[in-house]
Amino acid sequence: MLEKLIKNFVAYMGVASELEFDADGSYVFPISSLVRMRVRQNADEEIIISAFLGEIPASMDIEKAYARMMEGNLFGQETGGAALGLDSDGHAVLVRRVPGEVSQEDFASYIESVLNYAEAWLEDLGLSKTEQE
């Protein structure tokens, strides 16, 4: 089901490139030059949408950045129901879990929502000025 959702979404977006996979088998979405998005299904059949925001530079006030992320996470009010966090390499990520059985329209809405919030958080945290992986 996930593969079909992704292929339909990529076709809808007009992305001509082949779908890529990363080391953990996640689909890598080539839909934004600022945000690297990944989509996979977990063992509970939920769809996990993640947006890589980048490394918080050492020149930033790390405690202030972390506090801002925690404020944004409160009740999902500034994340659209997603969660901000750090991956094992210390990079900021935005992650959203959605039901595995989702319509094509809802899937597209979830992807667009995560992308929009991710781009807003890039700006909020000042990461849009740093180089993304």
Curated annotation (Swiss-Prot):
InterPro entries, sorted: Tir_chaperone
Any matching Pfam family: CesT
Residues annotated as transmembrane: none
Superkingdom field: Bacteria
GO BP: protein secretion by the type III secretion system
Similarity-based family: Belongs to the chlamydial CPn_0713/CT_663/TC_0034 family.
Listed name of the protein: Uncharacterized protein CT_663
